[in-house]
Structures are given as structure tokens and as C-alpha cells.
Amino acid sequence: MSAASAFAMNAPSFVNASSLKKASTSARSGVLSARFTCNSSSSSSSSATPPSLIRNEPVFAAPAPIITPNWTEDGNESYEEAIDALKKTLIEKGELEPVAATRIDQITAQAAAPDTKAPFDPVERIKSGFVKFKTEKFVTNPALYDELAKGQSPKFMVFACSDSRVCPSHVLDFQPGEAFVVRNVANMVPPFDKTKYSGVGAAVEYAVLHLKVQEIFVIGHSRCGGIKGLMTFPDEGPHSTDFIEDWVKVCLPAKSKVVAEHNGTHLDDQCVLCEKEAVNVSLGNLLTYPFVRDGLRNKTLALKGGHYDFVNGTFELWALDFGLSSPTSV
């Protein structure tokens, strides 16, 4: 609901043309400007203030904010005082009454008009999305989808963030069958561990040993909430989340490096640096997987890092040379 609609719904019911014509007193004409203040907890905070991303408690829908009209410094009047002033003005200048009546009729009609915006229908959104895909892509490219029905042989494995703004298939125009994609909070790759993070380990193993991907990309992005959490969560002490803090600390070495080398830099700038450094940490963690190291030695696999800046519309790509050597025996 717009501020104007909310104001109209809270306005007294006597504000209409007919009631003013019958009133024994009137008010001065003029433009009464109002501002609206929302008595809720959604005030913006400084970018340097550490955010509390997730609370370890149920989150419920917030109640509708209380919207109250406050008159600007033009008059500094209460609502009732403004109405009384309007009545007084109309008594003194009766010729303004038709103009005021017409304007009030317009406001009343606007307030009474139904909201024509249809409510969001998630099922309809999914249906229409699939229909669009099928008619514009699936039906128009039968050769591709016939081939995909036989199996997949992607050249790329991509680690990307779960952030809804950075879908790698959209950003990099990957076609179906072209990239084996893993998405998680802050696009992180944990080190090899058979008991923890097995979902990531299984994906890497399948991509390298079975799909025979040739490239593994780890792609960070601008304004990453997971990285901001990493930079602002305390390194020690009790957690405020069930999963997030433990997960983002996979790239704690990136935070440590940024803080050590850029202490005193604004938090926003530190986050940008950490977004890229965390990619390098993940690339390093990939080296802890034996089959990844084997692929690098045999030159059947390459690792690359990237950073997508959706604010400025730029993309950085880099490769790391780890200088791996063949094992020696003594």
C-alpha cells in the first residue's frame, strides 16, 4: 500500500465535499503537505555497523507499521488544526469552496478506488515461466535437448553464490549441459573432509572423476551477504546462527589477510577485498582434493577464480599457478 493510500485510509470520514458544504465553519485553502513516518524497526543503519544476519530464534512476519501524518514545517499543525484552519478559510473566502470541494472529492475517490494490482501467485509464476522456456527454447532447439537426453559432458564446474542476483547461467550465458554448477552461501569450497561438507566433496568428485570437467571456476560477487557476515561475525565466542557462522568461516583465512593488510579501511572496501580473497582461499582448498591435484599435474584440469560486480556490470577472471610438482620417493 502506498503512503498516500495509507494516509487516505486513516483520514477521518468527514473529509468530503458534501460535509464541507453543510459545515458552519470552514478552513483556509492551500496545499497541505504531509510526510509520513513509519513507526517500525526498519530504519537504515550505518554501513560500518556489523549486521546481525540471522537470529537463532523463529522469525515471524512483522506487524503492519503504524503510519501517522505529521505536517511539515510549512505549518507544524496537527491534523485537526489543519482541518479547522481549512474551514475557517472557506468561511472567509466562500469563493474557494467549489475548488476545495472538487479537490476533496478527488482525494475521496482516490482513497475509495480498489487496488488493481493482482496479488503474487507463485504457482502461476512457475507455470508461466516453464511455458515461456518450453515455447522459446525447448521446442525451438530439439537437437540440443535430444543430445542432453543421452547424457551430459560439461566442460566447466562452477562454484557460485546462492544469491538470487548472480545466477551463473544467466550472467555467463551458459547453455544447458555446458556447466556443472554448485551454489552455496558465499560460493565457498571447504577443504577435503570425508565427515564434513560431504555435499561439496561429492560434487567435486563427480565433476572431476566422472564428468571429466576441464575447468573449475570459483566465482565471487559484489555485495555478498555471506562475505559481509564473515567480516563482521566475531571470530570467537557463542554463535548467533545455527549454520551460517560455521560455514562462512571456511574462508576465515581470507578475512584474516584482509584485516591484517587493510586495517582501518572502511568495512565496505574490506568486504570487496574479501570477496576476491575468499575465492583464492577456495581455490587453495580445492588442492586438498587428491583427484583435483592429479588433474592439475596431468594438465587435464585447470582452476580459475572470478568476481562478478553487478553494481558496475564488470567481471574479473584470473588463474592461479600453484607450481605443483610430481611426488618423489626416498
From Swiss-Prot:
The keyword Ribonucleoprotein does not apply. PANTHER family: BETA CARBONIC ANHYDRASE 2, CHLOROPLASTIC (PTHR11002:SF56), CARBONIC ANHYDRASE (PTHR11002). SUPFAM superfamilies: beta-carbonic anhydrase, cab. Belongs to the beta-class carbonic anhydrase family. The keyword Thylakoid does not apply. InterPro entries: Beta_CA_cladeB, Carbonic_anhydrase, Carbonic_anhydrase_CS, Carbonic_anhydrase_sf. It holds the Pfam family Pro_CA. Possesses a transit-like peptide, but it is proposed that this peptide is not removed and that therefore the enzyme stays in the cytoplasm instead of going to the chloroplast. GO terms for biological process: carbon utilization. Reversible hydration of carbon dioxide. This is Carbonic anhydrase. GO terms for cellular component: cytoplasm. GO terms for molecular function: carbonate dehydratase activity; zinc ion binding. It comes from the Eukaryota. Keywords: Cytoplasm, Lyase, Zinc. It catalyses: hydrogencarbonate + H(+) = CO2 + H2O. Residues 1-109 are annotated as: Chloroplast transit peptide-like. Its main location: cytoplasm. It is found in: Cytoplasm. Its EC number is 4.2.1.1.
